[in-house]
Each structure stands twice: as structure tokens, then as C-alpha cells.
Amino acid sequence: YLISSSKLRKARQNYQNVSPYFNRMRDTISRVVPHLPEEPEHPFFHERNLENPRRAYLVLTADKGMAGAYNQNLLKFLREHADPNDRFYVIGQVGYRALRHRDPRLVEEFRYSATAPTLQRARDITVDAIDDFKSGKLDEIYIVYTKIQNALTSEPVMERLLPLDRRFLQPAPKGLGDPKGEVELVPDAWTVFEQIAPIYMHGMIFGAMTESFCAEQSARMTAMDSATKSAKDMIHDLELEYNRSRQGSITQEITEIIGGAAAVQNNE
């Protein structure tokens, strides 16, 4: 429990450090998108093959177990939302082992660790995702991870990574005298978007990785706390049973001694 709580503090601090970066990237790209021309449409917004899309899920599980129902809930959520022809790109050894040889949708050559997420790991994953989307290998890419709802609860969620949705990339209403209200995009909106869109996506993946890792440590701490309490209760019950058995044995021995002494006296 103490080790889990220590890891949770570090993971939570890392998540809190990452959140402002991701929020700023979302704000930045939301201020660029309205300046993009409607035609031609940027490939990152292109929705294709709508009737039967080639869909992939980037699934963030843990590298280790003993975290309660953390991994089971995530995989159950994935199976409930996925179609038979979808593909699973799984981060984390637990999810990989759970699906390997059991689910043909798993992409076995895709293997990444979930422990101690790094920005470089998120970049590598983003490059692979963008390449598969641009080449037409995939039509839709979703990320499935565990989102922290509050200090005590978390739950699996699914967010679309590609294609991007303009509806969710709109700038917040400008406040009175807001110095960020107007932006000048140099050389043009398309070029700026080409540069920041991949950064936004790997920030999105990195944010999900750090949040999932934090949720994993929280689930493991809760599981270890529950296991510790259960062990203490078991020890208490065993001590009571031992004391009762010991007391019964002592009582039996005393009874036998008294009975033997009485028999000796009667014989005399």
C-alpha cells in the first residue's frame, strides 16, 4: 500500500504537469481551425468510407496486474464498442497478453510499455497513427483509456483521434479586451495547421497515457488497501480461532488432570 501510494503521488504530479500543456495545445489548434478554408478540406478532417470504415483502437492498459478491475473494465468496454473487423493497438502488457492468441483483432507487432509515459513514446505512436491514416490503411482511429472522474473514481472512455472533428475544435468565446482574440497566421492557416496538428495529436495521446497511468496507480493503491484490510481481518479471525482452540486444549488438559487425580484418590 505504501509503495502504491508513493507511485500514485508521482503519477498524479506528472499528470498535473502535463494537463496545462495539453489544454494549451487544444486552445491553440482551436484558434487556427476556424481560419482553414472549407475547400480543399485538409486530410485530417476527411471522413471516408462511412458505411464500412476501417477502424482502429489505441488501447491503454497496464503493464502489471493487482490493480483491481482496472484492466478488466477497460477490455470489457473495448469489446462492447468494437466491431468484428476493427483492429486493436494495445499499449501495456496486461492487455496485450489478455488478447494475444484469443482475439484476432489484436495487432501483435505493435508493442509499447504503459509504465512511466514519455513524450517521445507518444510521438512515435502518433507518427504511426498519422501514417496509417494518410495512406488509407485506416479510416478512423480512436483512443480508449481510463479517465479520472474525481479523486476516488475513474472509468473507461473513448475519444476519436482521427479524423479530427471541427465541432470539437472551436475557440472559446472571446472575453472583453481579450488579447488572444485575434491571431495572425504566418505564412497561412494551412501551413500552421500542418505544423501543430501532429503536436496536438501526440499531446492528446501523451495526456491520455499519463492520465491512464495515474488512474492505474490509484486503482492499485485502492486494491492494496483493500487487500491489507482483508489480511488484517483474516489475521484477527485466525487469532480468535487459535485462542479458542488453545483455550479448549488447556481446558481439556486440566479436566483430564483433575479426572486422573480424582481416580487416584478413589483407588487409594
Model region roles, listed by residue range:
Residues 1-268:
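C-terminal beta-strand-loop-alpha-helix "lid" module of Rossmann-like NAD(P)-dependent dehydrogenases
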